[in-house]
Regions:
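Sec/Tat signal peptide C-region and signal peptidase I cleavage site
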Residues: 22-26
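Noncatalytic scaffold domains of N-terminal-nucleophile
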Residues: 27-61, 73-237, 241-243, 248-290, ...
């Protein structure tokens, strides 16, 4: 593997300059309320023929270029995912997994589950020590790694729906890895923030901390080993990852470091086509991901509860109180009842029904908070997103993850990528809080060999009341994915915000237990926060991270693409 540090030379500048918006145009900058953290709202990119919104501007441009060359939404989203594995190693991945929601122009919708699975050697209490404490092994190091699903998933969606040759959609990522790209400030910050953890693992430190320090903004990053891995995938499809040289290197790393993933685990991995969940909110149709993602069920339950109330003014105490109470109830069900449908029987029809939502509304007081501990379950539990709309009106929302930034921190020597730490998304011990801040209850998401761990990923497509494509969105950000997607949808439909304003708007988050509300800086006016505290809500301020949404909306002006200011990027279209 080779890497090169340099300050921008002519070659570096030409490489960076090659990735500029095609014929998409930006509207004028607008101002949101001055109290918002992101008060200067960057304009959406507007294009007539196709749009890509991803968490890195290079990834967005790769997808837009595929559309311009005649590729469809699936071609573009596969190309974006592979490019993202190069330019966003902290989150973009081939060592993780994810979910796709895809709607064809004619109206048929599909969902693909390529979530990681527990290795065959995994055991129920593998992260609980002799004192009953959950160890760090669930999120850091080789024992946190699940069997990767990304390459199998990307291959399968392209096999079924892609138009361009497979090699053509992988080729941009190969070029980026081989020729290099300029590291920007946000990605340099991510590396610097993970420096101490990366130092613990020699293969990761050797490449990502050359000379003992991380790459900095302005350096050019070349990844020869990753380019070679992508060449194998381009030549052989999923077989080029799950068998042969790449698989051998993954297994060798597992043996060297003490991980559990074996040759048989890799050979036996399969993605699964599932039926998307569908619901309605104030006349709009919501198409979203079913379990093993918890995102779709939790989103639909929350929207169904909200549908019984008239919207209050955005940011008011009444508005924020209701949101907190709805999130509390939807997450309580999520954390106790949901899991892998191959292992767990779930009451999905009930949880997503309007009758159940009405029952939940009867437990909500509009004048005070309901402590989560007082709610009984009603019996009968680093990510990235890409949104694409092509010229034919096909729409795709894809969310992938390796969980934390740089996943397990285990870097596959000679292959050039990080492996996930998704085993932390299982319930290591009922009642324990995982590193995403979720206290999971019961056994629905317990560790079992071959089982898919519960996810919060929420790729979603929204149709307007006349059945026309309206909105395509998703998010990264752990448990906050669900509430970010929920709030953007409600901001658009209930508060009639333009898409950019809906994404930029301040957010709050409650995942039932622990019983406290996360808030962005300046998310609540002081008098609103005081009123909510008097009602019994408890807040903590999260200054760093609050999920990042990528979204596309169909408007009279064309396709609007918006990315989230919380991790700077840009959409691209033509």
């Amino acid at each position: 593997m080779s890497s090169l540090r340099c300050h921008p030379s002519l070659v570096c500048a030409l490489l960076a300059g090659a990735f500029v918006p095609l014929t998409g145009r930006a509207q004028d900058t607008t101002s949101a309320p001055a109290t918002w953290r992101y008060a200067q709202v960057a304009p959406p990119v507007v294009a007539q023929h196709g749009m890509v919104a991803a968490d890195h501007p290079i990834s967005s441009q790769v997808g837009a270029d595929i559309l311009r060359r005649g590729g469809n939404a699936i071609d573009a989203i596969v190309a974006v995912a592979f490019a993202h594995a190069v330019v966003e190693p902290a989150a973009g991945n081939i060592g993780g997994g994810g979910f796709l929601v895809y709607r064809q122009h004619g109206g048929r919708a599909f969902a693909l589950d390529f979530r990681e699975t527990a290795p065959a050697a995994a055991t129920r209490d593998m992260y609980v020590d002799s004192t009953g404490r959950v160890t760090d092994d669930s999120w850091l190091g080789p024992r946190s790694i699940g069997v990767p699903g990304s390459v199998a998933g990307l291959w399968e969606m392209h096999r079924r729906f892609g138009r361009l040759p497979w090699r053509d959609v992988v080729a941009p990522a190969i070029a980026l890895a081989r020729d290099g790209h300029v590291v920007d400030q946000p990605r340099a910050d991510m590396l610097r923030g993970s420096e101490d953890l990366l130092k613990r693992y020699e293969p990761a430190a050797r490449f990502w901390l050359p000379g003992g320090r991380p790459f900095v903004a302005g350096d050019t990053l070349r990844q020869a080993d990753l380019a070679a891995t992508l060449e194998l995938i381009a030549d052989s499809g999923a077989v080029g990852f799950y068998r042969g040289r790449t698989a051998d290197r993954i297994v060798a790393e597992m043996r060297r470091s003490g991980g559990l993933v074996t040759t048989a685990d890799l050979e036996n991995y399969r993605p699964i086509w599932r039926t998307p969940l569908r619901g309605r909110y104030r006349g709009f149709e919501i198409i979203t991901m079913p379990p093993v993602s918890s995102g779709g069920v939790t989103l639909l339950e929350a929207l169904n509860i909200l549908a019984g109330y008239r919207p209050a003014r955005f940011g008011s105490a009444a508005d924020r109180h209701l949101f907190i109470e709805v999130e509390r109830r939807a997450f309580l069900d999520r954390n106790a009842l949901l899991g892998d449908p191959a292992f767990v029987k779930m009451p999905l029809a009930r949880l997503t029904s309007t009758a159940y939502a009405a029952r939940q509304r009867r437990t909500i007081r509009l004048d005070r908070a309901t402590p989560t501990a007082g709610l009984a379950l009603h019996e009968g539990p680093h990510t990235t997103n890409y949104s694409v709309v092509d010229g034919q009106g096909n729409a795709a929302a894809l969310t992938t993850t390796i969980n934390h930034g740089f996943g397990s921190k285990i870097f596959v020597s000679g292959a050039g990528f990080f492996l996930n730490n998704e085993m932390d998304d299982f319930t290591a011990k009922p009642g324990s809080v995982n590193t995403m801040g979720i206290q999971q209850m019961g056994e629905a998401n317990a560790i079992t060999p071959g089982k898919r761990m519960l996810s919060s990923m929420t790729p979603t497509i929204v149709l307007d009341p006349r059945g026309r494509l309206d909105l395509v969105l998703g998010s990264e950000g752990g448990a906050m994915i669900i509430t970010a997607v929920l709030q953007v949808i409600v901001n658009v439909i209930d508060h009639h915000m333009p898409l950019a304003e809906a994404v930029y708007a301040p957010r709050i988050h409650h995942n039932a237990l622990p019983d406290s509300v996360a808030m962005e800086p300046a998310a609540l006016a002081p008098e609103v926060k005081a009123r909510l505290e008097a009602m019994g809500h408890h807040f903590y301020r999260n200054p760093f991270y609050f999920a990042t949404v990528t979204a596309i909306r169909v408007t009279k002006a064309g396709l609007e693409g918006v990315t989230d200011p919380r991790v700077p990027s840009s959409a691209a279209g033509y």
